Structure formats: structure tokens, C-alpha cells
Swiss-Prot record:
Gene Ontology MF terms: 4 iron, 4 sulfur cluster binding; iron ion binding; NADH dehydrogenase (ubiquinone) activity; NADH:ubiquinone reductase (non-electrogenic) activity; quinone binding
Keyword 4Fe-4S listed: yes
Record's keyword terms, sorted: 4Fe-4S, Cell membrane, Iron, Iron-sulfur, Membrane, Metal-binding, NAD, Quinone, Translocase, Transport
Protein name: NADH-quinone oxidoreductase subunit B
Organism: Beutenbergia cavernae (strain ATCC BAA-8 / DSM 12333 / CCUG 43141 / JCM 11478 / NBRC 16432 / NCIMB 13614 / HKI 0122)
Length: 184
């Protein structure tokens, strides 16, 4: 006879980390970070046709202090990179980053000195969303993937250590102009 049988009906037994993961994934608030063409598709995701509010993301926040998800949509110029980083630093923990579109993920067709060749050179990215521009359905799918990632994340100091390790690895990444490979 286990504890489940002794508990009165209507009670649910769960780990605190599972409940916190469920709550976090159901109440993501994205910060407004539309930088280029992909921002149009990101805005379309907020319309009634795609209804992002069913995932707890009704309003895109203008203040980073009220947001916990940054959707970097579009190319990031060298001049905009410090601003993007500052907005990220102003977001409260826990925070997540979704890189939307090929330009945000790798610089896209803009392989030049003026565009950051992937936002992961300035921020730790949790989900990469390919496409030029990605459709709203693809963004919704990426958000659902992020929900699963959030739900299974550890709590407390373990999460902070993991986030610091990911950020350090991202900032140590080799810049694309120094990479050698098939195109070199």
C-alpha cells in the first residue's frame, strides 16, 4: 500500500521541480526584439490566426525586466550587438533565447563586417529556428520545443551553473570568419 492510496482523492503527488517546470513553461513572456524581416513573422504569430496566447505568451513585453524569453528575429548588426546584450543582461533569471531565422542564427546571406555572424557570439542561445523567414507555425513549434526544454531543466544552483557554462562556451566559439572548411 503506497502513499498514493492513503492520500485523499483530489490530491496530486509531484516533485517541486516538475511543478516549477510546468509553471515556467506555461507563462513565458517574450521581450520585443524584432530586428529585421523575421520580426514580421514573429508579429504574425501574435495574431488570432496563430494565437500564441494559448501558450501563455499574450503580450510581447517592451521592458526586459518583465520578460524571460528573447526572440532575436533577424540579423544583428555590429552596432546593435551591444544593445541586444544589454537587453539580455537586464532580463531577470531564468531567461531563454530563441534565435529566429538564418540571419540571427548564422548571419545568413550577410557575410560581411557589419553583421554579427550568429547571435550566439553575444548571447547563449537555447533554440535555433532556421528559415528565411521562418513561418509562424515554425516559431510555434520552436516555442513548444523550448517548453519541453524548460520543463526538464534543473532548479537552483544547478541551473545557474549550467547557464554560465553554456554562455562561456558560446562566447569562446570561433568566429565564422576564422573557420576553415568546405568553403575556405
Amino acid at each position: 500500500m503506497g502513499i498514493e492510496e492513503k492520500a485523499p482523492s483530489g490530491f496530486m503527488l509531484a516533485k517541486v521541480s516538475d511543478l516549477v517546470g510546468l509553471i515556467r513553461k506555461s507563462s513565458l513572456w517574450p521581450v520585443t526584439m524584432g530586428l529585421a524581416c523575421c520580426a514580421i513573422e514573429m508579429m504574425a504569430t501574435g495574431t488570432p490566426r496563430f494565437d500564441i496566447s494559448r501558450f501563455g505568451m499574450e503580450v510581447f513585453r517592451a521592458s526586459p525586466r518583465q520578460a524571460d524569453l528573447m526572440i532575436v528575429s533577424g540579423r544583428v548588426s555590429q552596432k546593435m550587438a551591444p544593445v541586444v546584450r544589454q537587453v539580455y543582461d537586464q532580463m531577470s533569471e531564468p531567461k531563454w533565447v530563441l534565435s529566429m531565422g538564418v540571419c540571427a542564427s548564422s548571419g545568413g546571406m550577410f557575410n560581411n563586417y557589419a553583421v554579427v555572424q550568429g547571435v550566439d557570439h553575444i548571447l547563449p542561445v537555447d533554440i535555433y529556428l532556421p528559415g528565411c523567414p521562418p513561418r509562424p507555425e515554425m516559431l510555434l513549434n520552436a516555442i513548444l520545443e523550448l517548453h519541453e526544454q524548460i520543463r526538464s531543466e534543473p532548479l537552483g544552483a544547478n541551473r545557474a551553473e549550467a547557464a554560465r557554462a553554456v554562455e562561456a562556451a558560446a562566447l569562446r566559439a570561433t568566429p565564422t570568419h576564422e573557420m576553415t572548411g568546405l568553403l575556405a
